[in-house]
């Protein structure tokens, strides 16, 4: 049986794929006058930290160079979209029951997210994450280490749990997160479907299962 679980947050425990995409789409329209293609979002935005996204944005047009204020602008727009759609600010079905059961069983748990601190604080408050995770068990993009697909965030999460990465299950939804988990030597990977035909997009031998929700997740996927 695997000893601990590390969760990505956005898109994994909380379905916000389209809200994230819309927030970035608004900025691409504003500054580049074009739409953000689905494939472009998936490869160059989804699951990446803002430092890497900023580097990508600055590669689009040599005459248009931005600083972190553009990513800050996006996060403000994203949080506003969440506030405008409170019906969307809910966990994926089965998440609360799974977290309750794992906490009661003493299973070590952490969150490893590409979010920066402003969104981490927003998520802690909105979802009352302190019910299951102390702040030191929420590892986020503090710009001191490379973001996904680098393995650092998952290596740090496993270390916080006091576990070898091979003894951990990771729950992810993005290509970059999948590659990060693989590079970290994670023992088992569960991928939540965030788009149609995801199985045909993501091919990785580490993937144990694709899921739509967390109903019946524990203990099934730790065994």
Task: Give residue ranges: language-model regions.
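Asp-based, Mg2+/Mn2+-dependent phosphohydrolase catalytic module
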Residues: 1-3, 100, 116-118, 122-223
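N-terminal helical cap/lid subdomain that shapes the substrate entry/recognition surface
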Residues: 2-96, 100-105, 118
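Ser/Thr-glycine-rich phosphate-binding loops at phosphate-binding pockets of nucleotides
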Residues: 12, 16, 113, 177
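Conserved SAM-binding loop
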Residues: 13, 109-112, 170-171
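Secondary-structure boundary/capping motif
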Residues: 15-16, 66, 111, 119-121, ...
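Hydrophobic alpha-helix-in-membranes signature
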Residues: 92, 107, 148-150
